[in-house]
Amino acid sequence: MSTNRRIGATDSKSRAHLLDVAERMLLEEGYAAVTSRKLGARAEVSPQLVHYYFRTMDELFVEVFRRRAEESLQRVAEALAEDGSLVSVWELTSNPLGARFNLEFAALANHRKAISAEIAAYGERFRQLQHAAIAARFDELGISAEELPPT
């Protein structure tokens, strides 16, 4: 028997605040510290409000990851459009805070399939961006991809 439970608006300021606080907690204390009760207390809302916006903690974690992943992909696309330099892309994606974020989500993905699937989808999109940039650079230089060994 399914219920028609209400879910909060995805563009709500309260929802965005919960995502911000959850991300801070994740980076400061690790993913295990992010529970609906602790998140509610830190965000100064009830745990029920957390579940009003996110049916499950998996849904919350996916949204935290997705938000940063989308920002990352956007920054990478902009860097490639500006100068086409892969160095600028790699500099963008190799900051310590980003590394900590990715490590927490990698650890979380060991226990939650939804997170694992989201990371895989992001990885594929990021790979496609890099592939397109490398292929374009090869074309500019008149290099055939077949001329270079993969290693």
For each predicted feature, which ranges?
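N-terminal intrinsically disordered/low-complexity leader segments
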Residues: M1-K13, R24, I143-S144
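Helix-turn-helix
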Residues: S14-H17, V21-E59, E63
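Generic hydrophobic alpha-helical segments
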Residues: A22, V89, N102-A106
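Amphipathic alpha-helical interaction elements
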Residues: Y52, E91-S94, A107, H111
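The DNA-recognition helices of helix-turn-helix-type DNA-binding domains
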Residues: M57, V64-R68, F126
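Hydrophobic alpha-helical connector segments
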Residues: E63, E70-R100, P150-T151
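Amphipathic alpha-helical packing segments from all-alpha helical-bundle domains
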Residues: L73-Q74, S94-L103, K113-G142
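Short, intrinsically disordered, charge-balanced linker/junction segments flanking boundaries
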Residues: G142-T151
